[in-house]
Amino acid sequence: MKKRDKMKMMGILILLLAVITVAITLILVSRLSKTAGKDQKEETFDRSVSGMLSNAYILKSEEKDIIVLYRGETYFAEGKPEKKYTGVADIELTKGKVTKIYAKPSTIKGVLTSYSSKSVQIEGYEPLSAEKDLPVYLVASSGHAKIPVRQGKISDLVVGNSKVELVVAEQKACALVSYQEDMAEKVRVLLKNGKENTYASLFVCSGDAYTVDGNKRKKDTVTDAEKLLKGEKTGKEIKISPDTGGLLYRCDENGNPYGSGYEGDLILRKEKKGYVLINEIPMEDYIRYVLPSEMPLSFSYEALKAQAVCARTFTYGQMKNDTYARYGANLDDSIAYQAYHATTSYEVTDQAVADTTGMVMTYKGKLADCYYYSTSPGYSENLEVWNAASPGYLLAENHTREKTKDLSSDKAFHKFITAKADAYDENSPYFRWTATLSAKLGMDETYGKLKKLKVNKRSTSGYVLSLTMVFEKGERTIEKENEIRYALGKYLLDLDLADGTNKHRASSVPSACFEIKSQKKGTIVLTGGGFGHGIGMSQYGADAMGKEGKKWQEILGFYFKDVTFTNVFDLDT
């Protein structure tokens, strides 16, 4: 055979092999695509593997076709199932083949009300101890989903909202299966007892008739948590519901209310250290009360609408936060989340919420992380102040006419903070401020008396990222924005604001955007600007933009780059 013919024959063979390879690949892909997706791998069980797989999910078991989801991976297995079965099961393997399927059909159905690393609770039931690393299976609501079942985490579920099946064996939670992927319509707010999460005693009353776990109570009747929950196990909940239009109050044992009442239901929950009080309320009603708690009624109407969208976006973003999952709550009523003063609703804020019902901010199809604060010094900040990576929609930008882009040097920051600025926030009393610190106001337990401060590092927005406090007996370096503000607050004697007002002994300096003006004889003077962390939407800035005629979408688009606005129920969860 000539060399040319040999080369031709070799080319044909290579082409034929390529075609065969592509064909085989297409066959495998077509088979795998029914259960596999980008986030789940496809495997076959190794022939050397024998033993038991606990709490796996059987996707399919017909004749010799067995498909198993286990620890996030999809396996195609050989075997002869006794009958068709889909769901959670223990699987016996012998040399890589399925030899027995032990179905686990025993389930508790209901709403997930609480969870921790050791237990899970379904509404109406006591908490059950849970398997370590409890598997959670999320079943798609559509039968045409590319991934019909995927393995998730329990934090993918929403306390007080997610409808689940808890798989139980030998009085222990083995797995959770969720069939619902809708966005939450209710929020559970833990009502704190000052800085504590629990109450030693707890009384509830109402000016109207109400029900306690379905049992009618007359108006002005006092419900005592201790009497209801005495002898009950930890985690036991009692739901108190008002009659239509009624409010529920926390009160003393004689029925004298503490503050204003709450819409929605109050849930009394027994814990080891006392009782937890939770307000379960529809999402939009919660936003109605957050809005006037977070923004003055006198602010422009478009700013109020922007704040409503911010508050709603933030709340939905917190629904899967597991901080209070053990108590059966999504968040609390403190400023650590959002101020929630369930006092009085107002027509203007109610209307702002109604006009933006369900609207949230999204970025690339996902819910955006929404942050807001009182006053910008004229330069927005990103997550650098929290030592975290920033998403593309949160940028550090100069919002004054002075377009200096980098304020990380002391010289550039001094020029910025002392210049007359033209900014949206300039009418805020916190736009510029002077803080006077006195070493006489505090004594560090370890290092003694405060001597001086040193700024080690600034962000490009001018915010202090690293501050060293020099004491008589040593030094302490702080590198978190909030900790810097409150550490200095211990020594804060006077705070003089831009509108001429003075605040004596405030709890913290308004922001970490400051310079050290002077320090001598135990007195340190700071010059700064802004109030809050500086990330996201400035409320005073939003007010000014609204008064200029800008719509809420423009306001939010100014502070959050390239975001879109979507009804939360249209989101792909």
Q: Predicted segment positions?
A:
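Conserved, single-site charged/polar hotspot
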Residues: 2-573
